[in-house]
Amino acid sequence: MRILAFFATGSEDAEFVITVDLLRRARIEVLTVSVDDSNPVALSHNINVTPDRKLSDLGDEEIDEFDGLFLPGGKIGVSNLKKSDRLMSIIKRFNDKKKLLSAICAAPTVLAYKDIMSGHKFTCYEGWQGEVDGIYNAVGVMKDENIVTGRSLNYSIDFSLLIIEYLLGSDAKEKVEKGILRRE
């Protein structure tokens, strides 16, 4: 399985790093992709991250080889993600093909930007739910069809494990849980 992890200046540091880390522990190939042209990219708490690739360097055929995508939160980062027309096009294309769309914290509003959340159950950071035309649930993590959402940084591990379970099954999820001493 292959996932695109999109991020931008101001994306939430821990949500991004924890999710990428746990997906890679599950042997999911994760390509970190900056929608910015800056390198490194400064995340919301001034941690600088060098992307594997910049979105401007990826062709559509290469992008379409991936099985899904991940979007971290962070107020400024989410605003910057929404500014990328190319990212919006990729999200729509992935949804049309029922590929995984995963977003945490304020990032479900990026999915809502193209009405993808309409009629779907979701969770997000408190206060952002009004920007999403979907069915809000005040829970830590949620899956509805091909969409996985997480409420906040506090739920980053649960969010990552739900993505792993969705893509690879419960055995892979349990293996990662055991490896991080989540379930002893």
Regions found by a protein language model. Give the residues of each.
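A short, Lys/Arg-enriched amphipathic alpha-helix followed by its capping loop at the start of a domain
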Residues: 18-28
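Short glycine-/small-residue-rich flexible loop motifs, especially phosphate/cofactor-binding loops
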Residues: 20, 39, 108
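N-terminal beta-loop-helix "entrance" segment that forms/cooperates
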Residues: 33-54
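Active-site-adjacent pocket-lining segments in enzyme domains
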Residues: 4-5, 11, 26-34, 53, ...
